[in-house]
């Protein structure tokens, strides 16, 4: 029991260290030895949990996917109307970006560093955005169904596609400018999608 707890703790330390390093210096610039040194684990422990750097990165992305989507869902769960939940997805991103020092999206950053379109890392990035897309589509359908007289002429699939483009552009520009104004513009643009 104690050994299992220690193994989980070591794995978590490795992931926390990798999260910090990948976010601050990128995937390619982060070496395995640096992760091992900064996490304070033995090489054998590292390789027991993560046989390759790609395995570590994949675990990092899966953890990020879960935490980011849960954060968005928690944010929109506090909203009372279909309209506020729909808009809440992009509204949730400004505080998230500020908390991450405007480093942008882990998935976009990782995909930019991984040229192979068949890479598991790129596939995980796409999976993240597909999960986000499914959430937005669900909220778009909920919005249309909440007031068919007002929103009945809207195409939930088209709105979802436009919303995704706005999110991607807003996140990328917030990282480039190291400022939140692109997110605020993105919020206004999403609001206009359904007006």
Task: Describe the predicted segments one by one.
Residues 1-25, 29-41, 55:
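Basic, helix-initiating cap at the start of DNA-binding domains
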Residues 54-56, 110:
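A secondary-structure capping/hinge motif
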Residues 69, 74, 84, 99, ...:
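Amphipathic alpha-helical packing segments from all-alpha helical-bundle domains
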